[in-house]
Curated annotation (Swiss-Prot):
This is Polyribonucleotide nucleotidyltransferase. It is found in: Cytoplasm. Coiled coil: none annotated. Belongs to the polyribonucleotide nucleotidyltransferase family. The gene is pnp. Disulfide bonds: none annotated.
């Protein structure tokens, strides 16, 4: 049991790979340590191919263990439960660059499991997990065309930073994760604070250059371990099947891909596919999965050829035209903000809801709890593509698309100081034919403006495709669903008129150069400007008035030492204020008070009462107060909540007063002037000084 270790410097951190000691019954297991963040990544492949051999059954699981951060899980069971949103997103991040590196026809089930075992809060486990998955797949002997490298790139003070610490990322204008092989970029996931396209592209190139260090280290580790390749060979091309499918399907598929309407097109293609499969599988002549795969290849060839050689897309558009856009805002009467964004056959109904501080989402992250004041949820019900299906908790894809849309919108959101509301956006995809996540970005921007949120401009998103054959390539603007999986690169860009806020790329082949990416980003910018123009026609600026049904939040500051007085014994005082005024009140430890109410006057009344409680008595000021109790020598008058002062009998009137009760009774409202506050805090009042 002699572990093999490989160590290298990666940005500011030292990374080590170790294999051979832990999880030895897996096909491969690598322990990755990056500055104290330790991830165990295992790979297991089934030796027999899947009986449903028309797809590659790859599963990626990413799990964070509470012990990694020295914590015991909360909840009744005190153990880890269903995956968090962060775990789901990281699993997708690992999956996306490794999936295209398995060969067509490989249908053995493969499972990659990444387990976070130790956490340095400054080092996100996503990069170590991706590197570990790459190393484990390389060592496993599976037909994996890797290894890949992965890097996080920040942009601070005009310079790129490799694998910045978490505290640096918070102040960075860019948080970009890039993954790729030695020769090609495969995946980009990023969020930016409105940066030019050139800066984004530069970050991708920088990250790809830097990750070569990690790729070399994995190759050296594999050499030292000695990898035994799997005994798998791609099945030989069945020339007779290729010819038969071509003869039976080409004409019908060609007709189908000339139908612009999605549902009519899919119906035609379905009929053609069924007829060909029935004809070629009769009496066991050919394997059904092999026929399906060949039909798919022919479809890909037809669509790609039409685009590359004729500049003709499925719905008849040229390469750079965006589908027709229609926009309506304020579509739902009692929501705080809403928008219906339709682009071709993709439609999103997006709703913005404003809430108070107590509506913030409490995230129990591995590095500790924090509050999320902006949420964006994306729903993709089966009816949006004309299908039936289960409706329930969000799937991985919905979580991923929601996060991408949130990244796109985040940069235009006001701070809590500027707009003290917790905001939740929900994007309901009501129709879908490609780029629904980007429709969600556009709809979210419009819904926020409809709700009266003071955004820093509008943001729009567009999904792009790219087809490359040798030296020829075509960039497609605003791709449809059928174009999505037939291209060599699909990427989504969200941004304002001034720059990019989110960029997501998935690249399936080698040969896509920075120059090609630059042209693609330029074309995406043109499309984005067109969409922003359409949005500006519908709603040029945030509404000046919020919905009548949205809470009004009043924010002001009190002396933190007075918080106890506002809350009262057992919360009695603040409870009385909220119940009597119908408001919601939040007080933070630094004395910031936020009062939320749908009725503006109720909010003002609650504020007045809190200010009265926290106010200091001022010498020389006249107050109206209630006589609290009578004494032989004078009367105590309540001038502020919880603050009484004494009106001495000699200060009640200019006339001689024999008995206090001759002039005053308990409960009387009187005007008094503060004469002095002695060292013990006792307040002397006068009624006659007012007269």
């Amino acid at each position: 049991m002699n572990p093999i270790r490989k160590q290298f410097q990666y940005g500011a951190h030292t990374v080590s790979f170790e294999t051979g000691e832990i999880a030895r019954q897996a096909d491969a297991a690598v322990m990755v340590d990056m500055a104290g963040t330790v991830v165990l990544v295992t790979v297991v492949g089934r030796k027999d191919a899947s009986p449903h051999g028309d797809f590659f059954p790859l599963t990626v699981n990413y799990q964070e263990k509470a012990y990694a951060a020295g914590r015991i899980p909360g909840g009744f069971f005190k153990r880890e439960g269903r995956p968090s949103e962060k775990e789901t997103l990281t699993a997708r991040l690992i999956d996306r660059p490794i999936r295209p590196l398995f060969p067509d026809g490989f249908t053995h089930e493969v499972q990659v499991v990444a387990t976070v075992m130790s956490l340095n809060p400054e080092v996100d486990p996503d990069i170590p997990s991706m590197l570990g998955a790459s190393a484990a797949l390389t060592l496993s002997g599976l037909p994996f065309k890797g290894p890949i490298g992965a890097a996080r790139v920040g942009f601070v003070n005009g310079a790129y930073v490799l694998n910045p610490d978490g505290s640096v990322v918070e102040g960075s204008e860019l948080d970009l994760v890039v993954a790729g092989t030695a020769n090609a970029v495969l995946m980009v996931e990023s969020e930016a604070k409105i940066l030019p396209e050139e800066v984004m592209l530069g970050a991708v190139v920088f990250g790809h250059e830097q990750m070569q260090t990690a790729i070399r280290a994995i190759n050296e580790l594999a050499e030292e371990v000695g990898v035994t390749p799997w005994p798998w060979e791609p099945s030989a091309v069945d020339a007779a099947l290729v010819a038969a499918v071509d003869e039976l399907a080409r004409a019908g598929l060609g007709e189908g891909y000339n139908i612009a309407d999605k549902q009519l097109r899919q119906q035609k293609l379905k009929e053609v596919r069924k007829a060909v499969i029935d004809a070629l599988t009769a009496e066991g002549a050919h394997d059904e999965n092999a026929v399906k795969r060949q039909i798919e290849k022919l479809e890909e060839e037809i669509v790609r050829s039409n685009i590359l050689h004729h500049g003709k897309r499925i719905d008849g558009r040229d390469l750079s035209t965006v589908r027709p856009i229609t926009i309506r805002t304020g579509v739902l009467p009692r929501t705080h903000g809403s928008a219906l964004f339709t682009r071709g056959e993709t439609q999103a109904l997006v709703v913005a809801t404003l809430g108070t501080g107590r509506d913030a989402q409490l995230i129990d992250a591995l590095e500790g709890e924090y509050k999320e004041n902006f949420m964006l949820h994306y729903n993709f019900p089966p009816y949006c593509v004309g299908e039936t299906g289960a409706i329930g908790s969000p799937k991985r894809r919905e979580i991923g698309h929601g996060r991408l849309a949130k990244r796109g919108v985040q940069a235009i959101m006001p701070t809590m100081d500027e707009f003290p509301y917790v905001i939740r956006i929900v994007s309901e995809i009501t129709e879908s034919n490609g780029s629904s996540s980007m429709a969600s970005v556009c709809g979210s921007s419009l819904a926020l403006m409809d709700a009266g949120v003071p955004t820093k401009g509008a943001v729009a998103g567009i999904a792009m495709g790219l087809i490359l054959e040798g030296e020829e390539f075509a960039v497609l603007s605003d791709i449809m669903g059928d174009e999505d999986h037939l291209g060599d690169m699909d990427f989504k860009v969200a941004g304002t008129r001034d720059g990019v806020t989110a960029l997501q790329m998935d690249i399936k082949i080698d040969g896509i150069t920075p120059e090609i990416m630059r042209q693609a980003l330029h074309q995406a910018r043109e499309g984005r400007m067109h969409i922003l123009d359409k949005m500006a026609q519908a709603l040029p600026a945030p509404r000046s008035e919020m919905s009548d049904y949205a809470p009004r939040i009043t924010s002001f500051t009190i002396d933190p030492s007075k918080i106890r007085e506002v809350i009262g014994k057992g919360g009695a005082t603040i409870r009385a204020i909220t119940e009597e005024t119908g408001t919601s009140i939040d007080i933070s430890d630094d004395g910031v008070v936020k009062i939320a109410s749908v009725d503006k006057q109720a909010g003002l009344e609650a504020r007045r009462r809190i200010e009265d409680i926290t106010a200091e008595v001022e010498v020389g000021k006249v107050y109206e107060g209630k006589v609290a109790r009578l004494m032989d020598f004078g009367a105590f008058v309540t001038i502020l909540p919880g603050k009484d002062g004494l009106v001495h009998i000699s200060q009640i009137s200019d006339e001689h007063v024999e008995k206090v009760s001759d002039k005053l009774a308990e409960g009387d409202m009187v005007k008094v002037k503060v004469l002095e506050i002695d060292r013990q805090g006792r307040v002397r009042l006068s009624m006659k000084a007012v007269e």
